[in-house]
Amino acid sequence: MEMLLGTDIIEVDRIKRAIENGGRKFSEKVFTLNEIEYCESRKAGKYQSYAARFAAKEAVSKAFGTGIGKNAAFSEIEILKDSLGKPYVRLSGKAKEFYDSLGTAGISVSLSHCRAYAVAYAVISLGDSFKNKI
């Protein structure tokens, strides 16, 4: 089985400044309402949560091999948590169409942060049909 990998690291203060200076316009362009609700509920760690999700979106887009833009918008890559707290990705729009076209078998993400930085990794597992796409 082949895999596509993506990673990203970001300074938490960069996201904090973007949210404070760009307000809802920035937040709603980059994050879904579910993500905003979750991050805002994390009072003390809200900016770390936003930054980790931003990094995860970048990591997924890098695993796609295209980055944000042509095949995926930030708001089309949603980072959620399951009942155990494990992060997972929900795609929509162009991002989902592109993902489905790859012949994938799954996508996994891992997020982490400290006070100053957030990092994320994305792994897209490819099915046998991917070999026919190259």
From Swiss-Prot:
It is found in: Cytoplasm. Its EC number is 2.7.8.7. Keywords: Cytoplasm, Fatty acid biosynthesis, Fatty acid metabolism, Lipid biosynthesis, Lipid metabolism, Magnesium, Metal-binding, Transferase. InterPro entries: 4-PPantetheinyl_Trfase_dom, 4-PPantetheinyl_Trfase_dom_sf, ACPS, Ppantetheine-prot_Trfase_dom. Its cofactor is Mg(2+). Transfers the 4'-phosphopantetheine moiety from coenzyme A to a Ser of acyl-carrier-protein. This is Holo-[acyl-carrier-protein] synthase. It comes from Ruminiclostridium cellulolyticum (strain ATCC 35319 / DSM 5812 / JCM 6584 / H10).
